[in-house]
């Protein structure tokens, strides 16, 4: 397995329309920068939390047994965690490498810590988020990112940096995308245009190990309105609906269509979840993929079992076998558009 996604917080300081964080009100710590984007709707507030240091240390210890890399997000902006610098230090004591994905709004505050940490392998900046910001703060944040890139080139030339524009094809973002590319060109002498993007050519070298990564926008998967959560069973063979017993684990139920066996309700497709990666939410729940922010395919809890045991659970095995056979056996997977990228 390549990576474990560890959601150190589900707090974010932006309310992007394309992200589940932006579809409900969120709280941010007092010292964080407030969002300049108003909430997109009036959905009820859901808990926003920060992973404890004890849980984080357990997560990286378990991650080191199955993977080489970690991310610090599922939802949320990881650099907002009050213990972000402390977590970097803890990570240095393991063989794990960090691929950090950030919206970049706080990069000026954490840049020194990142560049001094040998465990940081790659930094991904979601610059497409700025298309929804007023021009002035967007340009300020972008300049902070470009300044970081220049510093990294000087002191950490081994550090990979991706400047992401994952909104290609979204006409409302074109103006920002052109502005962003022009600013990158001014900073590094590159000449990359929007028209250069195609589904098989998404990454463009800017300079050194700095890349522009373009892609289309995707919709986050969600549970089907026809699904319901099974009651927790005492053993994987107890299923009141007569369905495939391997789809539930001993202690955790999953979402399945009402009255249907998951093994009979499949759709064509595959995913890299449980092959290249797995995710741990801020409360310790282990989920099948990096997009399952609400724990709809909860495989277990890292405080109850080892990560290796959870990955070997009946539910994980069932899903993994399905992916190998190009079967999406879970409604959450069937509602996911991200997996369509794998065939491009």
Feature names for model-found ranges:
Residues 13, 17-20, 272, 334-337:
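Cys/His/Pro-rich metal-binding microdomains
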Residues 1, 48, 263, 272, ...:
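Residue-level marker of regulatory loop/turn positions in helix-turn-helix DNA-binding domains and
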Residues 1-122, 132-143:
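Conserved alpha-helical substructure of the radical SAM core
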Residues 1-5, 22, 31-39, 285-344:
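Flexible mid-to-C-terminal extensions adjoining Fe-S/redox cofactors in radical SAM and related proteins
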Residues 28-33, 94, 117-305, 310:
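Radical SAM enzyme [4Fe-4S]-AdoMet core and its adjacent flexible, acidic
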Residues 6, 10-13, 265, 327-330:
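Processing junctions and N-termini across compartments
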Residues 24, 68, 96, 276, ...:
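Generic structural signal for secondary-structure transition and capping sites
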